[in-house]
Amino acid sequence: MSISTFSECITGAARSASDLVYKLIYSKRNRLIFAFVLTFVTLTLMTLTDRYGGGSDDDWAISLALSGRLPDSGLCLFVNAAISQITLALNTAFPAQNWFLVIEFIITATAFFSIIYGSLTYMKPLFGFLLIGAVEAFVLPGCTYESNFTFVAGIASLAGFLLLVGSTKTNSHSVIIPVAGIIFCVLGFLWRAEVLLLSIPFFAVALGFIFLSRQNRKSSISTSFSLFSVVQASIPYIAVIVLCGCFYAYNQAAWQEPEWAAWKDFNSPRSELSDYPMPDYEKVANDLTNHGLSKDDYFAPLMWITADTEVYTTETMEYLSSLSSALTFDNYLANVSEYLSNVSKSMPSHIILVVAFAVITILASRKKTALPQILVSLGFALVICLYFAAIGRLPERVETFIWLYSLSAIFLSIKHNAYDNDPNGTRKKLTEPYKTREVLASTTGLLTWVVATLLVLILTVPKFNPALLSAYLNQDTFRPNDPATEYASRDDGKILVWGTASYFDVEHAYRLKFLPSEDFLSKNLFLGGWTDRAPYTMANRERANMTNVIRGLAENPDAYLIIEEHREGHLPNLVLSLIQEHYYPNATIEKVESFKGKGPKDTFSVWKVRI
């Protein structure tokens, strides 16, 4: 095959691909069908999959908190009180489903559908397909088989602002689009308010450039940058602020109840101990001694051991958190350096690669006209990422949305009128020859989406398991297959107290999706964690006569400590030391049983404290 023939084949393929793209984007019906089919296929593959788990078990813990399978449930620290109460009511009325995950699935599906439709409507095809592909590859896994509520809040917020800014950009007369945008923004706020707030500067940038563009090209009253147009365009955003404010006030009122306020007051310093660096023991030893705290008392909360209600009071936790090290300039530099190193190591699969590709394609297709948007929006993203990296608070789920918000703001701010606003122009566009640059741009966008979709298919199709559908419809039919879960389910009268890291095996046995029975939960307790001192946790402990878990390990004849030796082999001696220091100086601890876990290196051991 000659070079000229090969070139003709490539050109022909590109024009054919471009024809498909324009037939899709110039038809509202086709965009809706495409959005529905892509949403249905990807969400089905990512939900009915043997892949599960990610970097966090928070969704599983939230699901438990709102399951109705623990006494005195009601609120959860991470989501708005309104969501907590609705989820709890649904779980109580229809316990066969895990309603927290059901609601997350509905939000994810509708938000992704809206992102597809909105991207192809309010952005040029190159940018629209690029954003859809990025969401498929970097966001949907976190919303589905990895199951993290931060990703769900992020995809809802992204969909909301995309619809709102898109309708503002095109002066859309549709009522459905802005209403849907308002709903998604509010859902993002309810699921995790910080994620919605993080998007505001980027979409403010998009709106700013959109209004500046109108001002620069005004030629009549209808296109002028008038006060009336600003007020009219502001109505949906004001609605978002008002609704979020109402839900914020409702949440604040719900947390005024004494038992819930006490949990929140305790968890605040507890989380600081987990999230911020602490000084070496030697530097604070004298202060700790003056407060009646030992070396073990100091280190235990750093390992999520706080279930001693007599030692670790709210006042004690506040004192310990006050010792947290103030970050020095050297710490900031070290954290930023570590962040940059991690980005370089994970570059083939890092969101920053999409950002770089997007910038290159924008500059190639728009020359310098989009440079201000790029500099401002990416500048915001870089500053925010470096700030969170410097203080050590930039997990992947946060970084991903910072860059996606930034890209979306750039894509939306670039001049483009919605196809639905000019039917005559659409018909003309479909019949006239395409410019070479348009063909290249639309083909490039389509190819990036195809690559992202192929990646999704490669990851999910081999793990597709339609048999899971029955478990989603009735979670009580799910039977975990794991030695740790089998041991924890035995009806032998034992009350098991788990190390937090050791309990991960049980969580993963349930695929971080399905919930154990009320009986199971009543006889499996923990040494700490963010649910410590929650009213439902304390009520569950009281049922087992283990209000003070550390002391209960010594005093309750049915209580046993269970750990995975590879991860938490140090815990038996630490727990014994805490008991000896505060309650029974002559207490001893012995291993009474052990068994192999599911992993090749996992060995679980069961310990009994004797007094």
What is the predicted role of each segment?
Residues 106-125, 357-364:
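Transmembrane-helix motifs of polytopic, lipid-linked glycan transferases
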Residues 139-140, 176-193, 204, 237-246:
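Membrane-interface alpha helices of multi-pass inner-membrane proteins
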